[in-house]
């Protein structure tokens, strides 16, 4: 059963996170204040308790926008109360998933929205220090964040006794160095501590023992920014949009051969058809597959049934895929699916930290080698079967989901496009070249 899925063309919805993206000077404090900036944080800190903020976010149905989709309010509630320890809030801005680029524009164009969201989140989880871990390649984003933090601190919006209350909160920017693995929350914390960015074994979970062994919450950029309109307009406003299990607005990204690739802020549950044809202007050439939520999500065939599927957590799970970050990638017919998956496998193999044997040997070793055989015309049918049999031996057997991220798209491609693998193996021919984006 689903709730009301508001159309992206429906006058009842309006953009909140991207309302000022692309506007001149939108990254400055003066611009943000002219448009009501920090008024929500000021009111909430004076009128609501931390527990009331958590309950409001729970009622809104906000789920993590970084890929996992865990309920945000529930995650916050895991933080201990009155334990006398330092609490930390971390914003994961290490946006490195191929096909994902939504957070970059929040960081670059509306950094004060993120800062206000982190003030609200920090208040809710009783954290007094926050860190924003920015992808190393996002230099402009990091520069603007640092400038925004400096502006906010100078006006008293960060630091001691915010808005005349007894709540203190400050922020710091940490620039990454280009490692995809740092997007995993425990590897990110190790990196912040100055250690090698290897993932940690869980439990203990970050809420019990996180950054420097202290209670910590890690949220995505879009997640934290969404807290501001929720606390401004209320949980009911947010929950009226979307589906039964996927509430509110979502930043959908679309890339590949479409007329208008980009980021579109639309209600959860918008269909692929609406995103691709009504917003992105339609494909530029024949399409064979859709990757629904960034490169780690299983691809789906480009069929009428799939096009009419709502882009929500529950609907895509029912289709054997995932919403992920909402980064839709279109694969044209002229591109070999084997080549596309081979390329992704090489990416994940390169980004593996090498800590866990299933990832180090399974992905960077066996998967890469099997793809090399099949893709260069030296494979046999048994290599395709071996690849298929290998995947469950890797999935779910490592400290972090990087190995799973390598397995899932290949698993989906074998489910829907296995004939392409078998054709290459039987005919002893390499993947068609050039298999490149125009």
Curated annotation (Swiss-Prot):
Assigned keywords, A-Z: 4Fe-4S, Cell membrane, Flavoprotein, FMN, Iron, Iron-sulfur, Membrane, Metal-binding, NAD, Quinone, Translocase
Keyword Transcription: no
Matches recorded under Pfam families: Complex1_51K, NADH_4Fe-4S, SLBB
Any one annotated GO CC term: plasma membrane
Cofactors named for this entry: FMN; [4Fe-4S] cluster
Enzyme class: translocase
One example GO MF annotation: quinone binding
Reactions it catalyzes: a quinone + NADH + 5 H(+)(in) = a quinol + NAD(+) + 4 H(+)(out)
UniProt cofactor note: Binds 1 FMN per subunit. Binds 1 [4Fe-4S] cluster per subunit. This [4Fe-4S] cluster is referred to as N3.
Subunit annotation: NDH-1 is composed of 15 different subunits, Nqo1 to Nqo15. The complex has a L-shaped structure, with the hydrophobic arm (subunits Nqo7, Nqo8 and Nqo10 to Nqo14) embedded in the membrane and the hydrophilic peripheral arm (subunits Nqo1 to Nqo6, Nqo9 and Nqo15) protruding into the bacterial cytoplasm. The hydrophilic domain contains all the redox centers.
Family annotation (PANTHER family): NADH-QUINONE OXIDOREDUCTASE SUBUNIT F
Main function: NDH-1 shuttles electrons from NADH, via FMN and iron-sulfur (Fe-S) centers, to quinones in the respiratory chain. The immediate electron acceptor for the enzyme in this species is menaquinone. Couples the redox reaction to proton translocation (for every two electrons transferred, four hydrogen ions are translocated across the cytoplasmic membrane), and thus conserves the redox energy in a proton gradient required for the synthesis of ATP. The Nqo1 subunit contains the NADH-binding site and the primary electron acceptor FMN.
Protein name as catalogued: NADH-quinone oxidoreductase subunit 1
Organism: Thermus thermophilus (strain ATCC 27634 / DSM 579 / HB8)
Lineage summary: Bacteria, Thermotogati, Deinococcota, Deinococci, Thermales
Underlying gene: nqo1
């Amino acid at each position: 059963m689903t709730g009301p899925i508001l159309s992206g063309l429906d006058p009842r919805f309006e953009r909140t996170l991207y309302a000022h993206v692309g506007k001149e000077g939108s990254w400055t404090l003066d611009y943000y204040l002219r448009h009501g900036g920090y008024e929500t944080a000021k009111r909430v800190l004076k009128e609501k308790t931390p527990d009331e903020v958590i309950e409001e976010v729970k009622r809104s149905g906000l789920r993590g926008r970084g890929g996992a989709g865990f309920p945000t309010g529930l995650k916050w509630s895991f933080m201990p109360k009155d334990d006398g320890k330092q609490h930390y809030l971390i914003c994961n801005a290490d946006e490195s998933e191929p096909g994902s680029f939504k957070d970059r524009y929040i960081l670059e164009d509306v950094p004060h929205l993120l800062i206000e969201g982190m003030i609200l989140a920090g208040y809710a989880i009783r954290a007094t220090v926050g860190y924003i871990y920015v992808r190393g390649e996002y230099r402009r984003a990091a520069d603007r964040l640092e400038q925004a933090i400096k502006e906010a601190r100078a006006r008293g919006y960060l630091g001691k006794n915010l808005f005349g209350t007894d709540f203190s909160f400050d922020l710091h920017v940490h620039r990454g160095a280009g490692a995809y693995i740092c997007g995993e929350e425990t590897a990110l914390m190790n990196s912040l501590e100055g250690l090698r960015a290897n993932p940690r074994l869980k439990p203990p979970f970050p809420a019990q023992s996180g950054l420097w062994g202290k209670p910590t919450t890690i949220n995505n950029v879009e997640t934290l920014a969404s807290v501001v309109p929720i606390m401004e307009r209320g949980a009911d406003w947010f929950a009226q949009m979307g589906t039964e299990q996927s509430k509110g607005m979502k930043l959908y990204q679309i890339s590949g051969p479409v007329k208008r690739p980009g980021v579109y802020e639309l209600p959860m549950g918008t269909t692929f058809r609406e995103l691709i044809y009504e917003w992105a202007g339609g494909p530029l050439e024949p399409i064979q597959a859709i990757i629904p939520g960034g490169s780690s999500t299983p691809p789906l065939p480009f069929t009428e049934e799939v096009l009419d599927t709502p882009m929500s957590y529950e609907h895509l799970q029912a289709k054997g895929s995932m919403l992920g970050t909402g980064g839709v990638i279109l694969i044209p017919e002229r591109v070999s699916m084997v080549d596309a998956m081979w390329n992704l496998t090489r990416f994940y193999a390169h980004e593996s930290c090498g800590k866990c044997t299933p990832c180090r040997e399974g992905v960077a070793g066996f998967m890469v080698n099997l793809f090399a055989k099949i893709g260069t015309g030296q494979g046999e049918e048994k290599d395709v079967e071996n690849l298929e049999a290998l995947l469950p031996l890797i999935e779910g057997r490592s400290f972090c989901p990087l190995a799973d991220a390598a397995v899932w798209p290949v698993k989906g491609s074998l489910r829907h496009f296995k004939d392409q693998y078998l054709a290459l193996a039987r005919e002893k021919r390499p993947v068609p070249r050039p298999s490149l984006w125009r």
